[in-house]
């Protein structure tokens, strides 16, 4: 005697237990079904026939008992192997059709083949042939809502046959159809049975059940009648279904992994994700808004921070990285700061490491021209100023050595002073301005340099002879600080050491002075700007986090709305990882689209800021980083909903509303 294709021994199924009453749905089912049989399982509502079908189709597991499929104990199969059985051995035909609403008839039929790893061209051709065979050649692109009930059920049958459909499990296939459509569906099932498919028909209608060769009656979870009209063993030996059984047994022994399936599944996941996003366009747009704003904020904030940093660094660097500043400082809080004298400046000038040295005597002071007033930094310098700071004069000329010796009341004004006080004067050279009510004649205008650090504006200064500043304005001959140009920018530290050694000698070993250099100041400013950029980016990242929470929220809602679709995919052979991939792909797709749109918005905002003369510097690293963060956000916040979807029970998912 040939081994039955399906063999159930003392199958029991109970629900509840613990705090809830235990309900026994199946109470010891013994059933054998051979290849090629057409079996009808008949019973009233609540008899346990649907539960039996779910166990037969590997959608559910029995509480106890033994289920052998092609001689293999199903209890020993893991979830992936059960999915393989559903995909390769079974084809489901449901009373409610259970088609995916967003997919066309062709796409619904192709679904089992996608999970089986069948190449796209082959599955397209096979699905089209099945639909043509069932009279739906002109309806391949129609969605379920565009089909009649009979047409939807035929699509469901075509889907059941896509991977061979060795065993057709039809649960009340005519229950939702009119009599004419019902007869057409039953005729199709008769035809499939005659071709060797095992057809298991679940119904409460005895007239429908009469079409089967074998009728099994079930009541209160027990088989009360099994009326086989022929010897099933004899039928199996002469029926073409025996060949299908041999093929199934062979493939089951070879393994359940479908080679190359992931490619088709990934493409299907992307296409399905795009369809869902398009169908729910408004909701998708609202979800994307959070990601778009988050990515755009991160990119723009970092671009503004980087632009500000580069601008400040360029302006500070314009003064030279070989510049050293010397000023008096207090050795401790209880003593007054030291004083740097002009004699010490002369002594320092003799050091070979120094090319130029310039004392500065300056302070903020009020400046007037006509009826206009302005606050500016007044710096008493010598004629080394343009060379030390690489700061040319664009109008007129710099004051001379003679002006310095004579304490001449002449001034070279910065660009901002020119714009504030002499904007309407075509030629400022020769004009007189009042500095602390002392008249000075403008002899030159410095080139623009911009802000050097923070709120300081280097262009808001006026250079006058050191002697004039000391006598006419400040009443002190000692410099406020000294500017020193090192001979070699690469040896600024060595130059500082030489200056410090000489100053300690001049001050009898007392370090009541301070040395700083432009390079150190630039590095300190760079650290400050980096911290500022990081702070701006962190603030912007919060909005990206909010966008991620929005993705999680929408995906949780999507899982709830599409629970039945998840059940359909599982019934057609999807593994848990396939469902996980499907919903994770949708979350990532949201993030990818949002990331791309966010980058586009950031570039647009950046363009507007540039037109508004705000320093902006986009970085490919920052853009790529923001996009990567959006992608990671999609994965992280989409994983929990996707895992929830993957862990759904197939039966529970299929019966959800």
From Swiss-Prot:
Residues engaged in binding ATP: 43-50
Compartments in which it is found: Cell inner membrane
Transmembrane segments: 285-305, 539-559, 590-610, 620-640
GO MF annotation list: ATP binding; ATP hydrolysis activity; transmembrane transporter activity
GO CC, alphabetical: plasma membrane
Pfam families documented for this protein: ABC_tran (PF00005), FtsX (PF02687), MacB_PCD (PF12704)
Superkingdom classification of source: Bacteria
Record PROSITE patterns: ABC_TRANSPORTER_1 (PS00211), ABC_TRANSPORTER_2 (PS50893), MACB (PS51267)
EC numbers on record: 7.6.2.-
InterPro entries referenced in this protein's UniProt entry, alphabetically: AAA+_ATPase, ABC3_permease_C, ABC_transporter-like_ATP-bd, ABC_transporter-like_CS, MacB-like_ATP-bd, MacB_PCD, Macrolide_Exporter_MacB, P-loop_NTPase
SUPFAM superfamilies for this protein: P-loop containing nucleoside triphosphate hydrolases
Bilayer topology term: Multi-pass membrane protein
Domain ABC transporter: 6-245
Self-association state and partner proteins as the record states: Part of the tripartite efflux system PvdRT-OpmQ, which is composed of an inner membrane component with both ATPase and permease domains, PvdT, a periplasmic membrane fusion protein, PvdR, and an outer membrane component, OpmQ.
PANTHER family in alphabetical order: MACROLIDE EXPORT ATP-BINDING_PERMEASE PROTEIN MACB (PTHR30572:SF14), MEMBRANE COMPONENT OF TRANSPORTER-RELATED (PTHR30572)
Its biological purpose: Part of the tripartite efflux system PvdRT-OpmQ required for the secretion into the extracellular milieu of the siderophore pyoverdine (PVD), which is involved in iron acquisition. This subunit binds PVD and drives its secretion by hydrolyzing ATP. The system is responsible for export of newly synthesized PVD after the final steps of biosynthesis have taken place in the periplasm.
Protein family membership: Belongs to the ABC transporter superfamily. Macrolide exporter (TC 3.A.1.122) family.
Protein name (database record): Pyoverdine export ATP-binding/permease protein PvdT
Gene that produces this protein: pvdT
């Amino acid at each position: 005697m040939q081994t039955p294709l399906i063999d159930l021994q003392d199958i029991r199924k109970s629900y509840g237990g613990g705090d809830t009453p235990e309900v026994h749905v199946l109470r010891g089912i013994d059933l054998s079904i051979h290849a090629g049989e057409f079996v009808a399982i008949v019973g009233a509502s609540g008899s346990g026939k649907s539960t039996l079908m779910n166990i037969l189709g590997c959608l559910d597991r029995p509480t106890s008992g033994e289920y052998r499929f092609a001689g293999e104990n199903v209890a020993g199969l893991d979830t992936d192997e059960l999915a393989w059985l559903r995909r390769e051995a079974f084809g489901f035909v449901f009373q409610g059709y259970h088609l995916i609403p967003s997919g066309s008839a062709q796409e619904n039929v192709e679904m089992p083949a996608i999970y089986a790893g069948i190449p796209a061209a082959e599955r397209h051709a096979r699905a089209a042939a099945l639909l043509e065979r069932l009279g739906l050649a002109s309806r391949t692109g129609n969605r379920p809502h565009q089909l009649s009930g009979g047409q939807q059920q035929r699509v469901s049958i075509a889907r059941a046959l896509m991977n061979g459909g060795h065993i057709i499990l039809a649960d009340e296939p005519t229950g939702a159809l009119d009599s004419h459509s019902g007869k057409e569906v039953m005729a199709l099932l008769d035809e499939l049975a005659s071709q060797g498919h095992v057809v298991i028909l679940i119904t409460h209608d005895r007239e429908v059940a009469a079409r089967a060769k074998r009728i099994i009656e079930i009541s209160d979870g027990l088989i009360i009648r099994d009326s086989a009209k022929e010897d099933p063993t004899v039928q199996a030996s002469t029926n073409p279904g025996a060949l299908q059984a041999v093929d199934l047994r062979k493939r089951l022994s070879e393994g359940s992994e479908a080679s190359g399936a992931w490619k088709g599944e990934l493409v299907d996941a992307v296409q399905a994700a795009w369809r869902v996003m398009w169908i729910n366009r408004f909701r998708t747009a609202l979800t994307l808004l959070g990601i778009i704003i988050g990515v755009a904020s991160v990119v723009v904030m970092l671009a503004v921070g980087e632009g500000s940093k580069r601008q400040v660094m360029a302006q500070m660097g314009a003064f030279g990285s070989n510049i050293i500043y010397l000023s008096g400082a207090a050795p401790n809080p209880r003593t007054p700061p030291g004083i740097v004298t002009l004699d010490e400046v002369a002594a320092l000038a003799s050091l070979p490491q120094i090319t130029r040295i310039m004392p500065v005597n300056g302070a903020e002071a009020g400046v007037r021209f006509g009826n206009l007033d302005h606050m500016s930094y007044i710096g008493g310098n010598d004629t080394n100023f343009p060379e030390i700071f690489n700061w040319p004069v664009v109008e007129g000329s710099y004051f001379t050595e003679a002006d310095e010796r004579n304490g001449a009341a002449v001034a070279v004004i910065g660009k901002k002073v020119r714009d504030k006080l002499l904007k309407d004067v075509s030629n400022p050279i020769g004009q007189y301005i009042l500095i602390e009510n002392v008249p000075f004649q403008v002899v030159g205008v410095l080139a623009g340099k911009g802000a050097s650090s923070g709120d300081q504006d280097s262009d808001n200064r006026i250079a006058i002879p050191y002697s004039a500043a000391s006598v006419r304005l400040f009443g002190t001959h000692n410099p406020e600080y000294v500017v020193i140009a090192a001979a070699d920018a690469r040896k600024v530290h060595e130059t500082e050491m030489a200056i410090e050694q000489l100053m300690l000698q001049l001050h009898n070993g007392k370090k009541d002075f301070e040395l700083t250099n432009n390079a150190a100041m630039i590095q300190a400013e760079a650290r400050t700007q980096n911290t500022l950029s990081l702070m701006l980016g962190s603030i912007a990242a919060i909005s990206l986090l909010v966008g991620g929470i929005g993705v999680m929220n929408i995906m949780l809602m999507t899982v709830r709305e599409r629970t039945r679709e998840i059940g359909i995919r599982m019934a057609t052979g999807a593994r848990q990882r396939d469902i996980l991939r499907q919903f994770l792909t949708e979350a990532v797709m949201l993030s990818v689209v949002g990331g791309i749109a966010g980058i586009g918005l950031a570039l647009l905002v950046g363009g507007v800021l540039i037109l508004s003369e705000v320093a902006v510097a986009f970085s490919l690293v920052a853009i790529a980083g923001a996009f990567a963060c959006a992608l990671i956000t999609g994965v992280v916040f989409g994983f929990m909903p996707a895992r929830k979807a993957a862990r759904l029970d197939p039966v529970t998912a299929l019966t959800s509303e």
